């Protein structure tokens, strides 16, 4: 495949599919890096694992990742179709890759060779209601590919079509959907398939297929919103005049602190801006276009009846006899005569997001959420800063601190160690820098109205007290240092638990090389949601390296860049202070300043090992791979790297293994010659802490194909 200026083009037909050739332009020199893997299944594992960094869009006309994965799937489907189903189960449950899993599952549903196997794996690969919808949407695309026997993998001919008019649900897909739908409970459906979400889906789809009708609908929705706001204002005015209090809603809002008013105004302006220029999909495929109503209709779903009735919006039975006849013993509650004849609907699930949106970021809200165990582990860790700012009770602090390092909660959290590190940074910032105290945070329209009512109903004396309280808002305060230290210690312990639970001990002596050159300051793909406050390749490399170090029987940690006035070598071995993450990070960043900003691989270090007969079992390289062949100074350097490693292999340790992690995921890696194959030179493209599992498995001699097969069989209870 050729890539020019980061734009994907159609791969050359004459190349074998497993020969991935990336051609880029760098300093007017052509760079060619070839990765060749003879086993189609191993290649498929590698290209799907690369999605850890950034998943493909799958809906663009010429999406390169979709092309590569589809070609790899077609090859494996001819030799071992069941393995594709097993891979989907593995990458969804172990690597937490969602969209690519759904694409692979859809492929299995469509392709004739995988259809006999997918039904027994489907329910373990599809976990959420949204996953089920996405699988069905991908299936519509793959049915189009299947019609041409997968010879045309581009979508230009259908991007502007109204795909809802040509929906296809074949028997295999229908059976899988019916089976999975029965596993969802009403709480899950309440999060993902409410009537309001269905309307939003159809509204966005309308923006692509019928622009004129969409404009009319948008205008009508805006008018309805303004009418509701006016009705609320008039109702409040009337109510207060009847009680002799002429203070209306506008007066009540003015009584609130100006800072709060500013926040409310900012939110309202953002809403207006969104209404003027909402995000519009570029094609029908980029817009979600299926709902659970569609699945019920096309897949003939009839059970569980009560949930089906609610999604379809059928009327509640008028009598108890009709109720029993309709739902029988499967009814979730006894007959309620007050609901007779009314339209049934899936209730919106009570979640922590809804509570915060309605009531604001206050201590009382957080206390209630945490004490009632309504705050999931991941949400709790991501919101530590908000919890600290809200000023929760000591009891709540104690609950949170204990829960952070609870082994079972950590194991089930599926959290990136980078996100744990971000939590430490958030707590440390709150302790050292502090924040401005706030009594009220952003809340939704309903919450704002309730806040206004609260002000209106106060007596004059209470209003004066409130104004006095508000003058104290905005003071610069810091979190108690003792509390902050407890939080940090708890998170550090959680990191150790997470690494120990998910990673076997790496035997022998492991040398970890972390690139700290200037190019490593580039931002990582994935954003705050995936990596938290750890945003650059440098931070990712250091944190990941420290994770590896924790599980090594014996280790050496090196940073490398280029020589400087302070150091005549391009690398430094750093003696780290124990296993604590923050002190180790600080030490590494401090030592980084002694090196230059260029990128040289420390082959001299390997020469030194050879000279001193230092036994090293594993080398782990964490870099953006600017050291790969083709970059500046590489003709000399590249040759030296190969010669140094080959000499060490011949004279000291013939079984040494090298793990090269390309954090940017571009497929660039050092070319070490034919002596190094996929068994002793493992190239990993992309960034994830699941890389740790790969290193552990490969270091122990495990075959990833067999690991995946065994995992999937255990999941479905056949092993």
From Swiss-Prot:
Pfam families: TROVE. InterPro entries: Telomerase_Complex_Comp, TROVE_dom, TROVE_dom_sf, vWFA_dom_sf. One of its GO terms (biological process) is telomere maintenance via recombination. Signal peptide: none annotated. One of its GO terms (molecular function) is telomerase RNA binding. Keywords: Chromosome, DNA-binding, Nucleotidyltransferase, Nucleus, RNA-directed DNA polymerase, Telomere, Transferase. Its EC number is 2.7.7.49. GO terms for cellular component: chromosome, telomeric region; telomerase holoenzyme complex. Residues 24-508 form the TROVE domain. It is found in: Nucleus; Chromosome, Telomere. It catalyses: DNA(n) + a 2'-deoxyribonucleoside 5'-triphosphate = DNA(n+1) + diphosphate. Its main location: nucleus. PANTHER family: TELOMERASE PROTEIN COMPONENT 1, TELOMERASE PROTEIN COMPONENT 1 TEP1. Ribonucleoprotein DNA polymerase that catalyzes the de novo synthesis of telomeric simple sequence repeats. Subunit p80 binds tightly and specifically to the telomerase RNA suggesting its association with a region of RNA secondary structure. Telomerase consist of two subunit, p80 and p95 that form a 1:1:1 complex with the 159 nt telomerase RNA. This is Telomerase component p80.
């Amino acid at each position: 495949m050729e890539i020019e200026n980061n734009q994907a083009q159609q791969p050359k037909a004459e190349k074998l599919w497993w020969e991935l050739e990336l051609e880029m332009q760098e300093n007017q020199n052509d760079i060619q890096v070839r990765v060749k893997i003879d086993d189609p299944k191993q290649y498929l594992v590698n290209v799907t694992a690369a999605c850890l960094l950034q998943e493909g869009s799958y809906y663009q006309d010429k999406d390169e990742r979709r092309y590569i994965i589809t070609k790899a799937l077609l090859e494996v489907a001819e030799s071992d179709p069941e393995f594709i189903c097993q891979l989907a189960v593995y990458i969804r449950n172990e690597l937490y890759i969602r969209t690519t899993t759904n694409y692979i599952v859809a492929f299995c549903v469509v392709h004739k060779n995988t259809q006999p196997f997918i039904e027994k794996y489907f329910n373990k690969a599809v976990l959420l209601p949204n996953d089920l919808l996405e699988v069905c949407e991908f299936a519509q695309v793959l049915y189009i590919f299947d019609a041409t026997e997968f010879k045309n993998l581009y979508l230009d001919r259908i991007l502007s079509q109204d795909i809802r008019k040509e929906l296809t649900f074949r028997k295999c897909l229908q059976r899988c959907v019916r089976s999975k739908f029965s596993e969802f409970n009403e709480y899950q459906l309440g999060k993902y398939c409410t009537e309001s979400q269905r309307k939003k889906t159809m509204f966005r789809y309308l923006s692509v297929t019928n622009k004129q009708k969409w404009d009319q609908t948008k205008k009508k929705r805006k008018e309805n919103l303004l009418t509701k706001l006016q009705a609320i204002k008039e109702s409040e005015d009337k109510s207060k005049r009847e009680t002799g209090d002429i203070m209306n809603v506008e007066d009540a809002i003015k009584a609130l602190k100006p800072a709060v008013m500013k926040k409310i105004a900012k939110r309202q302006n953002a809403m207006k801006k969104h209404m003027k220029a909402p995000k519009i999909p570029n094609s029908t495929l980029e817009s979600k276009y299926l709902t659970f109503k569609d699945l019920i209709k096309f897949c003939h779903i009839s059970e569980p009846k009560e949930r089906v009735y609610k999604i379809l919006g059928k009327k509640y039975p008028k009598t108890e006899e009709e109720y029993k006849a309709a739902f029988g013993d499967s009814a979730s509650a006894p007959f309620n005569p007050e609901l007779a004849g009314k339209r049934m609907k899936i209730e919106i699930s009570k979640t922590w997001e809804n509570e915060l949106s309605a009531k604001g970021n206050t201590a009382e809200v957080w206390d209630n959420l945490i004490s009632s165990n309504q705050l999931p582990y991941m949400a709790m860790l991501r919101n530590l800063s908000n919890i600290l700012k809200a000023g929760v009770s000591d009891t709540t602090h104690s609950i949170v601190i204990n829960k952070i390092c609870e082994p079972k909660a950590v194991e089930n959290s599926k959290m990136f160690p980078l996100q744990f590190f971000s939590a430490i940074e958030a707590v440390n910032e709150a302790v050292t820098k502090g924040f401005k105290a706030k009594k009220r945070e952003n809340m939704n329209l309903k919450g704002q109205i309730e806040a206004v009512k609260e002000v209106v109903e106060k007596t004059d004396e209470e209003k004066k007290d409130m104004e006095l309280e508000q003058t104290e808002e905005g003071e610069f305060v810091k979190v108690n240092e003792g509390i902050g230290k407890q939080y940090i210690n708890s998170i550090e312990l959680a990191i150790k638990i997470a690494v120990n639970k998910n990673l076997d001990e790496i035997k022998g002596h492991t040398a970890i090389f972390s690139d700290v050159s200037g190019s490593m300051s580039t931002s990582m793909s994935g954003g705050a949601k995936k990596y938290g406050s750890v945003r650059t390749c440098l931070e990712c490399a250091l944190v990941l390296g420290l994770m590896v170090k924790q599980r090594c029987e014996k280790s050496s940690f090196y940073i490398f860049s280029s020589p400087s006035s302070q150091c005549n070598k391009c690398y430094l071995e750093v003696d780290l202070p124990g296993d604590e993450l923050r002190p180790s990070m600080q030490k590494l960043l401090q030592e980084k300043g002694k090196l230059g900003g260029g990128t040289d691989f420390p082959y001299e270090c390997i020469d030194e090992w050879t000279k001193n007969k230092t036994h090293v079992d594993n080398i782990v390289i964490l870099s953006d791979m600017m050291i790969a062949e083709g970059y500046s100074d590489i003709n000399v350097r590249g040759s030296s790297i190969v010669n140094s490693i080959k000499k060490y292999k011949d004279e000291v340790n013939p079984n040494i293994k090298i793990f090269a992690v390309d954090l940017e995921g571009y497929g660039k890696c050092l070319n070490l010659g034919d002596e190094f194959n996929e068994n002793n030179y493992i190239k990993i493209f992309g960034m994830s802490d699941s890389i740790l599992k790969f290193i552990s498995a490969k270091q122990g001699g495990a075959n990833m194909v067999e690991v995946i097969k065994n995992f999937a069989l255990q999941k479905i209870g056949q092993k």
